[in-house]
């Protein structure tokens, strides 16, 4: 199924990054450091940004965290990293934003959870205060509903109303309906308090794959605010990656979604940037955006008893990802390049011909030579112990020939 045209959402400017409309779907991430620890948070924000995160969210839960925010923003800028930083507020955001105006000014957006900001009560002073600070500082907000902290009064009322229907919905359906209602009603309340329509982004986070698909389809049908997609918590490792992909792909194919995050639970001392790479890969696999040249490699079988093709595929993919920060500025379009590293003659030549550059390594009982294809045609055949280095030379030459801006010097390849 082809990806449907994007839903027509209003455009929200988040620190210079346009979200919604026909603008590219934005990849965002979140730190897991103590925000009050400026050095650790700066290091992680920069790592996430350099991995490709276009927006980075930080927890602002204490006075120390709020006081640290301007220092974090300034330190990142001093290192040349100007990624917009979003403040994540729960329970006490109204107090922190008022007491620390420099924090309010430094942040590019405020995330507000209507389930813990008094929205919907007779008095919504906490919510109103945060909206007023956003208006004063010309900042957008994301009104983020979580099913784990859904407004209990709203849910109870909707459950009671549902019980009176001739054919009541099940509890799951009512809960998802309540999430949509909470998001939309909160957005309308923000507008009543004076926030502009194009300063609001919505999200409705759940942990179940089918729940996410259903709630976002319902939310998209009743509003034109940009939508931020993601599971509340995806889980560890492959489970988290598969769950996020299974949840986001159908929604994105429907043309729904303007920003995404992969909420992976990192392994102890794991690399936080993995969530950025997974989000990018989801968008690139669907053909929605391109971030880095893709390496196609066969899974291996009895014909490929050597691990050389696996090691080479990993080395080439790593090389491409390392090169992308510099290539992004000097070689526009290189992110769409396709590279194939195949392990035997069965699919090697055919897959290589479908790539911009491909190599078919020898499998079991095959001659020890590796044909290289460029734009579908056999270019050369490599042999010996310098196959990887020679293939990288061909790859670099192709990149310079096809993508370099006129006048840019050629890359010097290394072994």
From Swiss-Prot:
Positions that bind [4Fe-4S] cluster: 298, 301, 344, 351
An individual GO BP term: isopentenyl diphosphate biosynthetic process, methylerythritol 4-phosphate pathway
Transmembrane intervals: none
UniProtKB keywords: 4Fe-4S, Iron, Iron-sulfur, Isoprene biosynthesis, Metal-binding, Oxidoreductase
InterPro entries, alphabetized: Dihydropteroate_synth-like_sf, IspG_bac, IspG_bac-typ, NO2/SO3_Rdtase_4Fe4S_sf
Catalysed reaction, written as an equation: (2E)-4-hydroxy-3-methylbut-2-enyl diphosphate + oxidized [flavodoxin] + H2O + 2 H(+) = 2-C-methyl-D-erythritol 2,4-cyclic diphosphate + reduced [flavodoxin]
Root EC class: oxidoreductase
Assigned EC number: 1.17.7.3
GO molecular function, one term: 4-hydroxy-3-methylbut-2-enyl-diphosphate synthase activity (flavodoxin)
Functional pathway: Isoprenoid biosynthesis; isopentenyl diphosphate biosynthesis via DXP pathway; isopentenyl diphosphate from 1-deoxy-D-xylulose 5-phosphate: step 5/6
UniProt KW Glycosyltransferase keyword: no
Family affiliation: Belongs to the IspG family.
Protein name (Swiss-Prot/TrEMBL): 4-hydroxy-3-methylbut-2-en-1-yl diphosphate synthase (flavodoxin)
Gene from which the chain derives: ispG
């Amino acid at each position: 199924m082809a990806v449907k045209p994007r839903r027509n959402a209003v455009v929200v400017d988040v620190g210079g990054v346009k979200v919604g409309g026909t603008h590219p779907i934005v990849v965002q991430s979140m730190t897991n450091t103590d925000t009050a620890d400026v050095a650790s948070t700066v290091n992680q924000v920069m790592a996430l940004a350099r991995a490709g995160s276009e927006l980075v969210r930080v927890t602002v839960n204490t006075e120390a965290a709020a006081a640290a925010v301007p220092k974090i923003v300034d330190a990142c800028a001093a290192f040349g990293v100007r990624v917009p930083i979003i403040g994540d507020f729960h329970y006490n955001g109204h107090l922190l934003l008022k007491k620390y105006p420099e924090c309010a000014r430094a942040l590019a957006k405020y995330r507000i959870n209507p389930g813990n900001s008094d929205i919907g009560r007779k008095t919504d002073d906490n919510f109103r205060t945060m909206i007023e600070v956003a208006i004063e500082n010309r900042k957008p907000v994301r009104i983020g509903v979580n099913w784990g902290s859904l407004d209990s009064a709203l849910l109870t009322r909707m459950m009671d109303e549902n019980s009176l229907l001739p054919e009541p919905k099940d509890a799951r359906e009512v809960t998802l309906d309540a999430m949509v209602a909470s998001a939309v009603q909160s957005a309308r309340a923000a507008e009543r308090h004076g926030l502009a329509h194009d300063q609001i982004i919505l999200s409705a986070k759940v942990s179940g794959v089918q729940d996410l698909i259903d709630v976002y389809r319902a939310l998209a049908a009743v509003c034109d605010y940009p939508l931020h997609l993601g599971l509340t918590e995806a889980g560890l490792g492959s489970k988290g990656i598969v769950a996020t992909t299974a949840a986001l792909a159908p929604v994105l194919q429907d043309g729904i979604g303007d920003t995404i995050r992969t909420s992976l639970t990192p392994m102890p001392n794991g690399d936080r940037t993995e969530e950025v790479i997974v989000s990018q890969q989801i968008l690139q696999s669907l053909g929605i955006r391109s971030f880095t040249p893709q390496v196609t490699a066969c899974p291996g079988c009895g014909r490929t008893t050597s691990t050389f093709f696996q090691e080479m595929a990993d080395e080439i993919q790593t090389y491409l990802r390392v090169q992308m920060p510099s290539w992004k500025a000097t070689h526009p379009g290189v992110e769409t390049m396709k590279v194939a590293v195949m392990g035997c003659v069965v699919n090697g030549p055919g897959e290589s011909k479908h790539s911009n550059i491909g190599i078919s390594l020898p499998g079991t009982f095959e001659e020890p030579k590796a044909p290289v294809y460029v734009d579908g045609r056999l270019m050369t055949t490599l042999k010996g112990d310098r196959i990887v280095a020679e293939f990288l030379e061909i790859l670099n030459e192709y990149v310079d020939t096809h993508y370099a801006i006129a006048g840019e010097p050629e890359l010097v390849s290394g072994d």
